[in-house]
């Protein structure tokens, strides 16, 4: 299963996951490995941009969910 992604893609996914998860040591680890594999800064920027968009959508949906819960006083499922 680990071989399903090539090493460059694996590191870009790691960069995106680290960005979305706010893990600076994880980002640095995958960033260094990605550069060693020849990943371009444009590719890194694309992964970070995508991660930020995913994170922002999740944050927005969670805020909306919390607001609904607080205004309806309905117990959580």
What are these regions (language model features)?
Residues 1-77:
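Hydrophobic alpha-helical segments
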């Amino acid at each position: 299963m680990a071989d399903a992604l090539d090493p460059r893609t694996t590191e870009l996914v790691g960069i995106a996951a680290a960005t979305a998860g706010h893990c600076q040591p994880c980002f640095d680890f995958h960033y260094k490995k990605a550069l060693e594999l020849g990943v371009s800064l444009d590719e890194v920027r694309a992964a970070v941009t995508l991660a930020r968009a995913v994170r922002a959508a999740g944050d927005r949906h969670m805020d909306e969910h919390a607001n609904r819960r607080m205004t309806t006083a309905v117990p959580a499922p």
